[in-house]
Amino acid sequence: RARCAALRARAGEAEQTDDAFEAQSLRTCLHRLVQYGCTHAKAADLVDEAASVLVHLAGQAACGERWCTYYFFLTPHAPRHSDEAVASVSICDGALVGDALGIRTWGAAPYLTRRLIQQYASADAHVLPRRVLELGAGSGLVGLGLAQWLGAQRADARVTLTDYDATVLANLRRNAEASHSLADVRHLDWETVYRDMQTTTRCYDTWAQKTLPHESDTWSAQYGGVDRHDQFDVLVAADCIYDPQHALWIHAVAERHLLRPTTAYPSPQLHMLVPVRRTHLAELASVHAVFSESSSFCIAQTHVIQGHDDFGPPSMSSQSPRARKGNPISCQHFVIEWRHDSPFHA
């Protein structure tokens, strides 16, 4: 037990220094303790403690179910009192199951929620979107935060939360019900939309195709799909690009579901927040390639947001010291609009 306490203290030191060698040494010792505890009855009580330290090193991804309340403010200055929040959303993050990564709240979600609320709060009333579609909603934080804030500004505001995985959809509906939100939960398969939008069949194979489930019709029947003719003022997507093909699929979804510019709503937009991870640079590059100036949609603005993400272990962070609140992370906020000379532009 004293050994576990010492290792827990070392885990805190490794977390602060982000020392990969130290962290690996700790994992080796902890795995040996777990193995020893599993084979020696007198040391069985070591298993739980050693395992808890391993979870601590693994970060949020290894945690079980938990509830967390997020508060959003119009001013960036801290500290703040929760009573000053213009929106607050309680979210349940479920335990990771298989490929259902969206069941956890990734670090990009609260940053995109805050940015959009602050942006719309400083805009003219006629710019406020009436219909919002969230892609790859995951735990639903972005859509639910917008639904709460927009609902207080205009009574006709409506937010639709979408995802693909059955486990994620079940948790998404749970969060929507817990927040007493008027947001709808729907199933949406980006790849199916992409294929429907193609004039010729294209054969390709991606990692996502190998890992994602194939019960699309089942989940559409259970949760309802998004009508192919539905159009929205704004589309939002936080940390949804984890395969280079996804940007292409999202482009197809935007072509189908993003409102064309009109006099009443001249600037429909797709907002994407993409974390810059050294393991996913190809995915980031795909966004620039797909939404280039030659596309019907193009990137109108790019903003950099600095923040923290405690989803993974310290090894996923940069070489800078790791803050207690998570791994430092840089996100790119893409504001994507219809190209003015696009044939799709109204």
Name what the model sees in each region:
Residues 1-346:
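S-adenosylmethionine-dependent methyltransferases
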